[in-house]
Regions:
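Charge-dense, helix-prone N-terminal extensions
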Residues: 1-95
């Protein structure tokens, strides 16, 4: 994914695109905080609430929490692509 760089956010490992947060490891190390459009977030949560969820803190923001213990590894590339599209400037989306 063009422009993605390793970084940190709130003291945890993160990925950013052009300085904009794409995802980060949650403080507890058991989940990731992933940028996600609201509509898609609701679909993920409705389809698998054990894997995808939010807390009150994230309710008004375009983020979803993803349980690393529950998520299917083959789902990660698609999730990263959705997050990348949500975070990256339109010009950078050549994937």
């Amino acid at each position: 994914m063009p422009g993605v760089e390793e970084s940190t956010s709130y003291g945890t490992p993160a990925l950013k695109v052009k300085g904009k947060l794409l995802l980060r490891l949650h403080d507890d190390g058991n989940k990731i905080v992933l940028r996600m459009p609201f509509e898609r977030r609701e679909e993920l949560i409705a389809g698998d609430p054990k894997t995808y969820f939010i807390t009150d803190h994230y309710r008004d923001y375009p983020w979803v929490l993803v349980s690393l213990k529950e998520v299917q590894p083959n789902a990660l590339p698609d999730l990263l692509q959705l997050a990348y599209r949500a975070a990256s400037p339109v010009k950078k989306r050549r994937v």
